[in-house]
Amino acid sequence: MSDLMPTLPGLSPVAGKSVVAKFDGGLLSSDGGLLLLREVELRLRVAERLAACIKDPRAPDQITHSLADIIRFRLLMISAGYEDGNDASSLRGDPMFKSALDLVPSDRDLCSQSTISRLENLPDAPTLLRMGGAMVDLYCASFHQVPKRIVLDIDDTFDAVHGDQQLRLFNAHYDEYGFQPIVVFDGEGRFITCALRPAKRPGGKEIKAFLRRLLRAIRNHWPRTEILLRGDSLLRPGGARLVSRERLGLYPGRRAHYDLTPSYRRPRGQHESSLRGRTKAG
């Protein structure tokens, strides 16, 4: 009977050994999905991209866990639902996590909670900006050809915290402490970048600085691509002036109250026509 049980093909080898996933019981793990996340990481190399932005102050001859491995372990922890860095103490010897980092169960343990904490406090402001730019580079690299136009959906979102995290702030609207990061997706729902910030509405100066860096990073890859911004009151007049100066298209959301000039109406109308065409075709 077990010979008829299907297997999950296509998993990459770990330390030169083949990996076979079956569904016939035996020793089970609730974190078996880490092997699939490993395949995503092998393709995208997110940990390596972020690690390349950080200057490692450690002595090279005394390093056991590379920055990329520490980041990769942390990303996998969060993806598997272990958001607390303290969980690393019990997960560093877990065979599934080891396999996801190209180690066999008998190999050394992964990094400790204290190592993760030191890494998370290592980046300064310029380093964080480089890391945000690395995510934009990853987004642009995901296209097989240069797009003629992209839509950037820009918004902020509330993220509650339950400790004494740095930058946490009480938000009266949500009646909780937390962060209020700015997040950017494209019109197809693909993540582009984000900026962690205190739980308050960003001002016009902050939005302009964020947009300026984002646009510069995108245009380093696609100088001729038309960019259409879509947002609500987050794109307040300070952001609107930047839109005009950078010759962008603006597609406000429901809470914005801008008097759109013809240069704004044209790309908005084109985008709405495109959406109607897709709806009819579907």
Task: Label each PLM-derived region with a short phrase.
Residues 163, 237-242, 261-265:
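A short acidic (Asp/Glu
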Residues 151, 228, 249:
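Hydrophobic "anchor" residues on beta-strands that sit immediately upstream
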Residues 207, 211, 239-242:
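Distinct, well-ordered alpha-helical segments
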Residues 174-178, 212, 245-259:
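Acidic, His- and aromatic-enriched active-site or binding-groove loops in soluble protein domains
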Residues 220-227, 245-247:
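Short, surface-exposed connector motifs at secondary-structure boundaries
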Residues 3-19, 249-282:
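An anionic, glycine-rich sequence signature occurring as long contiguous blocks
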